[in-house]
Design a protein with these regions (language model features):
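Membrane metalloprotein/metal-transporter helix-bundle signature
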Residues: 2-198
């Protein structure tokens, strides 16, 4: 179980939020605010996105310190690349299947408390992040800039990662990790449902 100081979590959260919020703040106007709000709401409005983002944080809480930091950073970074690919007109076959599969796989990784080195864990997260980012990029509202919309969904994603990371850490302190693994199993079951519904 990773022991991440609360001060470090707060600093990381503040830095990431400030970084991804800069594009939205640089262009004042109602359409930019609406774009940011729409992007922020997108990961929160769908169970597939919501569960996957939380699962990344929960899985990070089960890793050693380097991976505990790397996973929540890698996901939003690759997600942005996926959104840019969508905006540029590139096709990503079976993106929705990849998103549903991410809930199943990430849930299983949490359920079995799988520990991976960076060379194994980061590609897994990156693959699923690209699918989530592509879906976000395909949903940019008319009249909204990709930068402000993207800032919104990145902020929401980082918040969900941090929520999963902190919750996972606190739960493991109190229940020796069994409750976190149970959450992972529930998420995996949700992933099966999402895959069956496609």
């Amino acid at each position: 179980m990773v022991q991440v100081p609360r001060r470090k979590i707060a600093q990381l959260s503040a830095a990431l939020t400030a970084l991804v919020s800069m594009p939205a703040l640089a262009h004042p106007g109602m359409h930019h605010i609406a774009g940011f709000a729409s992007g922020f709401a997108h990961p929160l409005a769908g169970w597939d996105h919501l569960l996957a983002m939380l699962a990344v944080g929960l899985w990070a809480s089960q890793q050693r310190r380097t991976m505990a930091v790397a996973l929540p950073l890698a996901f939003p970074l690759v997600m942005v690349l996926g959104a840019l690919a969508a905006a540029a007109g590139y096709a990503l076959p079976a993106a929705e299947t990849g998103i549903a599969a991410s809930v199943l796989v990430l849930g299983l990784l949490v359920a079995f408390a799988v520990k991976m080195p960076a060379w194994g864990g980061l590609p897994v997260v990156a693959l699923f992040a690209a699918a989530h980012g592509y879906a976000h990029g395909m949903e940019v509202p008319a009249g909204s800039a990709l930068a402000t919309y993207g800032a919104g969904f990145v902020v929401a994603t980082v918040m969900l990662h941090l929520a999963g990371l902190v919750a996972g850490h606190l739960i493991q302190v109190r229940s020796a990790g069994n409750a976190v693994r149970a959450l992972g199993a529930s998420m995996a079951a949700g992933g099966v449902y999402l895959l069956a519904a496609i």
